[in-house]
Design a protein with these regions (language model features):
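Active-site-proximal loop/short-helix segments
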Residues: 1-4, 23, 65, 69-71
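Conserved SAM-binding loop of SAM-dependent methyltransferases across substrates and taxa
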Residues: 2-14
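Hydrophobic/aromatic anchor residues within beta-strands of the central parallel beta-sheet
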Residues: 14, 38-41, 130
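Hydrophobic/aromatic beta-strand patches that form the interior of the parallel beta-sheet core
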Residues: 15-17, 42, 103
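S-adenosyl-L-methionine
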Residues: 19-62
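S-adenosylmethionine
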Residues: 46-123
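C-terminal catalytic and target-recognition region of SAM-dependent MTase-like enzymes
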Residues: 101-153
Length: 153
């Protein structure tokens, strides 16, 4: 929820989507503690939300994605990022307006080059920048925790 709060504090109109109500409640509480208002909260699977937004023709100037590596749906449906990543990229590419941006981080072991390949396949003319997310160990070594990509349309 930190990205949603940062975007709102910078003046953006924000829609925060998460399938887990507790995450929405926690982020809403942080919004209130920060003195912010006006975030649109949607408790729903992000893929279902994106499919509907594409059908409605809704567009966004930016999309920030922080998908889980895996999860269980309300009926114990198993979800793995690797199985849905292509659809996520395709749907997001349809809801971001020209001149918009996408920021996506993953923690599934996908290297940055794989993220870049997927986004470039769907948006070949977009500008991309990708890298590794790391934590610095006490001995100074960097420990990889995930990947990040920024896409500008």
């Amino acid at each position: 929820g930190g990205a949603s709060l940062a975007a709102k504090s910078a003046g953006a109109d924000v829609t925060h989507v998460d399938a887990i109500r507790q995450v929405i409640d926690w982020t809403r509480e942080n919004m209130e503690l920060s003195g912010l208002t006006g975030i649109r909260w949607v408790v729903e699977d992000a893929l279902k939300f994106l499919r509907r937004e594409v059908k409605r023709g809704n567009k966004y100037s930016g999309v920030v994605l922080d998908p889980p590596t895996w999860g269980l749906g309300p009926k114990n449906e198993k979800w793995k990022l690797e199985q849905s990543l292509i659809e996520i990229v395709e749907l997001v590419s349809k809801v971001v307006e020209p001149g918009g941006f996408v920021v996506m981080n993953t923690y599934s072991g996908l290297p940055p080059s794989t993220l870049e390949t997927l986004w470039r396949r769907v948006l070949p003319d977009a500008s991309t920048e990708c890298g590794e997310l790391c934590l610095q160990a006490s001995d100074g070594h960097l420990l990889s925790t995930g990947s990040l990509i920024r896409v500008e349309l």
